[in-house]
């Protein structure tokens, strides 16, 4: 447990060392003031019960041992106070000192916690930022094997668990060891014999607590994994609610969610039961330890052979009892940390995931395209299945290539290899003779614009969706892009024009309007290469005409790779490639392929693109 905890600290704490130092300083001061305020109890007891009749004289430092000099001079000061002002005044003065030192102690404890809060909130922010940065950086292939809801659970639930367990326990993990060490030091000074006896008891209690803590981490990991499954279930239901209702599947999804939710309840019930065991177990072990020490110490005093007086023994027990609460908090914190470390393991599956699409160490600059694109014996696979198998293809500058074929033939994958959403496993793809793996991802993707089959829009204004990734665009450029995309008229008909919020994923717009905004965004970027996945969703005649006209405007003068679904787009392409099982089985113009009377003509007859 401690190894994982300190590994986590080394990863995230270094920027906040100053606050750690201040926290330690104030915790040390608080521990010292605690012990000193407790020490004032001894003369109060001796004065009340007349237990100390000795006469003290002032001792210089160095005239005897440090402990002996400090204790003697403290009693000398109390003695002078009694002689000058009487026992009642001396008692009031010592009691006032107790109040003052207690005030200083709690003030120091607050300042220690004050600095720790800065660390706690900052580290949680840093973890969230790192996860988000990693999500944005990781290749698309990583998320093909991950549930979207589970990724969201790690970003929300797991980070919250780290905050509520590890970071909330951070102050206890720094404060309690200092307090325990200070108390143990004082216990040794008061009675080393009694302290040796205590040391034989503490490891037994620690072993029992540690055994339960290890089991808690395993259960916590199961709980966080199941929470991810639950979020995935919710995300799928909300995203597919139209289908759920259309197929009268409400009872089916309710049962599926109820089963997952009950499973989560059982796991969390087990986890919380183990966690709640920490306090009563530490309470019982602490009380049992105190009882044994009381018996052993009392036996020494009653025997008359003890090196400790009755008031000193009471002070010793007060100090020892002061260890019990920090020890209980320490054990409770260790339980919480076990829960948090389980969440850290899940977070690290994202943070430590390998980014397989890497930039070259010395990237070749590529700011424009003059010659064209070339696929050379390209092969790519998902797992053990080759989905692109030995493709050779040349696309001249300014030309349009239409990829056609039945579902699963490899069209989308072939297009996704160009912007390096995935990397080829064999062969190469080059632009103007430069392998795209030798170009930085930023420069490569700056050459390309994407219009997806389903328009991907954000919960923001129309203007911000059009200028997404082109922040320097002027209002005139945005308006011009909207007009070319046939989107200007419907934009101006909305309540706030370009400043209208379109809702989550553009839910306030029609399907055709969403596609027109997506086209306007690509037009504003003005890339030399366009990757277009035509929408297959049915639009009304007017919207279909507007979208097709906008696409024609967008494709004009650009090198275009289009995953074609409309016969009109295919007919106008400079080259048509027919894919089947990851291979190009036919290529040519529309008229050439129709004349060959092969697979392409069969697809045209069936209208399956």
What are these regions (language model features)?
Residues 1-39, 48-98, 104, 111-116, ...:
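Membrane-integrated ABC transporters
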Residues 2, 33-42, 50, 92-93, ...:
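Juxtamembrane helix-loop junctions of ABC transporter transmembrane domains
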Residues 12-18, 140-141, 157-166, 170, ...:
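An intracellular "coupling" helix at the cytosolic face of ABC transporter transmembrane type-1 domains
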Residues 19-29, 171-222, 295-308, 325:
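Transmembrane helices of ABC transporter permease
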Residues 30, 34, 101, 105-109, ...:
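Alpha-helical transmembrane segments of multipass membrane proteins
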Residues 135, 257, 347, 375:
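Conserved catalytic Walker-motif region of ABC-type ATPase nucleotide-binding domains
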Residues 186-200, 274-345, 350-351:
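Helix-loop-helix
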Residues 359-360, 366-609:
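ABC-type nucleotide-binding domain
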């Amino acid at each position: 447990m401690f190894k994982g905890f300190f590994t986590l600290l080394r990863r995230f704490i270094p920027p906040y060392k100053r606050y750690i130092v201040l926290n330690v300083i104030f915790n040390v001061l608080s521990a010292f003031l605690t012990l000193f305020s407790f020490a004032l109890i001894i003369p109060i007891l001796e004065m009340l019960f007349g237990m100390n009749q000795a006469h003290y004289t002032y001792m210089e430092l160095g005239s005897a041992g440090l402990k002996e000099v400090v204790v003697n001079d403290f009693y000398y000061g109390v003695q002078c106070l009694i002689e000058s002002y009487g026992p009642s005044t001396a008692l009031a003065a010592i009691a006032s000192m107790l109040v003052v030192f207690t005030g200083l102690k709690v003030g120091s404890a607050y300042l220690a916690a004050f600095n720790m809060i800065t660390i706690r909130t900052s580290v949680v922010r840093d973890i969230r930022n790192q996860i988000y940065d990693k999500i944005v950086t990781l290749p698309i292939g990583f998320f093909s094997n991950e549930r979207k809801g589970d990724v969201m659970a790690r970003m929300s639930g797991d980070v919250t668990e780290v905050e509520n367990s590890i970071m909330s326990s951070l102050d206890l993990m720094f404060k309690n060891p200092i307090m325990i060490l200070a108390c143990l030091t004082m216990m040794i000074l008061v009675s080393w014999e009694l302290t040796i006896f205590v040391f034989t008891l503490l490891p037994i209690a620690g072993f029992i607590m540690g055994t339960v803590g290890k089991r808690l981490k395993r259960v916590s990991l199961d709980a966080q994994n199941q929470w991810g499954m639950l979020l995935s279930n919710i995300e799928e239901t909300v995203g597919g609610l139209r289908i759920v209702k259309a197929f009268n599947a409400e009872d089916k999804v309710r049962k599926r969610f109820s089963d997952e939710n009950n499973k989560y309840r059982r796991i969390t019930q087990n986890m919380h039961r183990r966690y709640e065991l920490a306090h009563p177990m530490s309470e019982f072990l602490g009380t049992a330890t105190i009882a044994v020490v009381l018996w052993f110490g009392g036996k020494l005093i009653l025997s008359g052979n003890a090196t400790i007086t009755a008031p000193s023994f009471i002070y010793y027990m007060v100090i020892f009892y002061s260890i019990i609460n920090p020890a209980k908090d320490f054990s409770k914190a260790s339980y919480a940390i076990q829960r948090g470390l389980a969440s850290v393991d899940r977070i690290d599956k994202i943070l430590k995931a390998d980014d397989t699409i890497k930039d070259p160490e010395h990237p070749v600059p590529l700011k424009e395209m003059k010659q064209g694109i070339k696929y050379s014996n390209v092969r790519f696979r998902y797992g053990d299945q080759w989905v692109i198998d030995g493709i050779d293809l040349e696309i001249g500058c300014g030309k349009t290539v239409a990829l056609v074929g039945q579902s699963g033939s490899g069209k989308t994958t072939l297009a996704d290899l160009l912007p390096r959403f995935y990397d080829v496993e064999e062969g190469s793809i080059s632009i103007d003779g430069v392998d795209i793996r030798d170009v930085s991802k930023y420069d490569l993707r700056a050459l390309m614009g994407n219009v997806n089959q389903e328009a991907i829009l954000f919960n923001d204004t129309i203007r911000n969706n059009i200028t997404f990734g082109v922040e320097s665009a002027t209002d005139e450029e945005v308006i011009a892009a909207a007009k070319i995309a046939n989107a200007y008229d419907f934009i101006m008909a909305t309540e706030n024009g370009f400043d209208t919020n379109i809702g989550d994923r553009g839910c306030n717009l029609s399907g055709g309007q969403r596609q027109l905004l997506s086209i306007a965004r690509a037009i504003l970027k003005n890339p030399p290469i366009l990757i277009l996945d035509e929408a297959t969703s049915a639009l009304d005649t007017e919207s279909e005409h507007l979208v097709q006209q906008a696409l024609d405007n967008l494709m004009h003068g650009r090198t275009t790779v289009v995953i074609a679904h409309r016969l009109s787009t295919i007919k106008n392409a400079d080259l048509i490639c027919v894919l089947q099982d990851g291979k190009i089985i036919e290529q040519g113009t529309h008229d050439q392929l129709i004349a060959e009377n092969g697979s392409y003509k069969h697809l045209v007859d069936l209208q399956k693109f």
